[in-house]
Design a protein with these regions (language model features):
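Class I S-adenosyl-L-methionine
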Residues: 1-80
């Protein structure tokens, strides 16, 4: 189990680093603000669970990430 917090950059797929691409592709669960998923979609595993939410839900997303990690899953929290 692990939690990776990955910054996706200022808002373009071209700004996403190889390390973030790898973290996303290796994750069982990806948690983040729903708008950000459009930038990482090509890197998601077909088996990944995506947990998205709206603005100002940072605490809820953090709790979701910890809950999934406590189940033994690899979690990536995407941020900008």
């Amino acid at each position: 189990m692990r939690i990776v917090v990955a910054g996706i950059g200022p808002g373009s797929r071209e700004d996403i680093t190889p390390a973030v691409m790898q973290a996303v592709s290796e994750s069982d669960v990806v948690v983040g603000y729903k708008y950000y998923f459009q930038f990482i979609e090509p890197y998601l595993s077909s088996k990944a669970v995506c947990v998205d939410s709206g603005m100002r839900k940072e605490r809820e997303r953090a709790l979701e990430a910890f809950n999934y990690a406590m189940e033994g899953l690899n979690v990536c929290v995407i941020s900008s």
